[in-house]
UniProtKB/Swiss-Prot annotation:
CDD domains: Ribosomal_uL14. The gene is rplN. This is Large ribosomal subunit protein uL14. The keyword Cell membrane does not apply. InterPro entries: Ribosomal_uL14, Ribosomal_uL14_bac-type, Ribosomal_uL14_CS, Ribosomal_uL14_sf.
Length: 122
């Protein structure tokens, strides 16, 4: 479960390393985001010379979440960290590579570009 003020790791090569959630999209008063949900983030740490700079505000999609999520078949999926992929205005990833596994829920939410770039889909 991701909420406002949650610190997250960036799982792409856009230049950002750490971000903080400042808004959860999906209706007035929505409190938590899970796998495949869009959030608004601010960049807290970035590499020099990257596409994204510190203090920049951008959209992101959650690709790994530490809180377990129940699937339709009754199984649960859980990761060791909370991670996001940064998105541009069109909803496409800003980076050209994805690091680490991503959840299968992204395929259901139509993030095919992220799924195709990911080294592993769980």
């Amino acid at each position: 479960m991701i909420q406002k003020e949650t610190n997250l790791v960036v799982a792409d090569n856009s230049g950002a390393k750490k971000v903080r959630c400042i808004h959860v999209f999906g209706g007035t008063g929505r409190r938590y985001a899970s796998l495949g949900d869009q959030i608004m983030v601010t960049v807290k740490a970035a590499v020099p010379g990257g596409v994204v700079k510190k203090k920049e505000v951008t959209k992101a999609v959650v690709v790994r979440c530490a809180k377990e999520k129940r699937r339709k078949d009754g199984s649960y999926i859980r990761f060791d960290e909370n991670a996001v992929v940064l998105l541009n205005a069109q909803g496409e990833p800003r980076g050209t590579r994805i690091f680490g596994p991503v959840a299968r829920e992204l395929r259901d939410k139509k993030y095919m570009k992220i799924v195709s770039l990911a080294p592993e889909v769980l």
